[in-house]
Amino acid sequence: MKLYLVILVTSVALAAASPTRTKEEPIEDELLEALLSVEKSLFNEETTVMEKRSCVIGWKQRGQKCERDCECCGVAATCIGERMPGFCGYRTTNNNLGQYILYGYSTVSNGVSAILCAA
């Protein structure tokens, strides 16, 4: 019986000391606002055409012609094509594990390629 009372008192004390839900409301409001802005951008043609990029000026975007991997914009973007010039893009596979391995390989390959291109 004493153990039951200790558990009851402890659980009531923890419930009283726990943070209230009002602290999480601004975070939920920010997430809802972000979701609404993304939803609006899907229907707005101007925002869907323009993509946010953090590339150096002169790097090629996805689909543009290239000769080396270091010319393409993106961490794992590579110059794809049998003949020169190729085009910038991402190598893909249907297997999820294979896709992660391919992404890692492309990232390392681009790092080495960037060093060689800078030299």
UniProtKB/Swiss-Prot annotation:
Expressed by the venom gland. Residues 18-53 form a propeptide. Transmembrane segments: none annotated. The presence of a 'disulfide through disulfide knot' structurally defines this protein as a knottin. This is U9-hexatoxin-Hi1. Belongs to the neurotoxin 03 (Tx2) family. 03 subfamily. Keywords: Cleavage on pair of basic residues, Disulfide bond, Ion channel impairing toxin, Knottin, Secreted, Signal, Toxin. The keyword Cell wall biogenesis/degradation does not apply. One of its GO terms (cellular component) is extracellular region. Residues 1-17 form the signal peptide. It is found in: Secreted. The keyword Plastid does not apply. GO terms for molecular function: ion channel regulator activity; toxin activity. Probable ion channel inhibitor. Disulfide bonds join C55-C73, C66-C79, C70-C117, C72-C88.
